């Protein structure tokens, strides 16, 4: 529909311009500010008001969408802990089987995540009791899985190599090296 409106505006503007009375006259149709300014205004109206940087709005919105959904699930798991600690507990459940290297992301984490670690063993134990029936052997790992859901988004760029990656051709082809000229011991530089 927008293209039809634009077409109608341009068609009306073309018919409103005076055409030369006879073919020898050098008549030019001046598409100046009278036509181009409303056209630019119309094109700006069609665009989104936000800049189209694909990663900024999506990354920010994904973080905000995950936390409310998890906080709605968190009162079902354990209602005694604050909501800041519970959003990490449901996110641990799919992550624990995937990541055996949880101490490494814990070392890269920020200090707010370290504040979550002392408070999470109780909700984490209660949330893990239905799935694995061995909560006590996993107690050292339970403070570390909350670190991983926050670190889960940065490790996703290494995940796309699951698809078969073709090795890039070398920039310089591998050519056999030519033999170096023999050096005399008298002309060789001294190396200390």
From Swiss-Prot:
Q: From which domain of life does this come? A: Eukaryota
Ranges for region Disordered: 73-192
Claim: Protease is one of the keywords in the record? no
Q: Could you tell me which SMART domains the record lists for this protein? A: Amelogenin (SM00818)
N-terminal signal peptide: 1-16
Please give the Gene Ontology molecular function terms for this protein.
structural constituent of tooth enamel
Q: Which GO terms describe its cellular component?
A: collagen-containing extracellular matrix; extracellular region
Is-annotated flag, keyword Secreted?
Answer: yes
- Which key words are in the record? Biomineralization, Extracellular matrix, Repeat, Secreted, Signal
Mark out the compositionally biased spans (Pro residues).
Answer: 132-173
What is an annotated GO biological process for this record, any one?
A: enamel mineralization
Compartment annotation: Secreted, Extracellular space, Extracellular matrix
UniProt lists compositionally biased (Low complexity) regions at 87-105
Which stretches are tagged as biased composition: Polar residues? 108-117
Q: What family is reported?
A: Belongs to the amelogenin family.
- Function in brief: Plays a role in the biomineralization of teeth. Seems to regulate the formation of crystallites during the secretory stage of tooth enamel development. Thought to play a major role in the structural organization and mineralization of developing enamel.
Mind telling me which PANTHER family this protein's record contains? Answer: AMELOGENIN, X ISOFORM, AMELOGENIN, Y ISOFORM
- What name does this protein carry? Amelogenin, Y isoform
Q: Which organism is it from?
A: Bos taurus (Bovine)
From the UniProt record, report the name of the gene that encodes this protein: AMELY
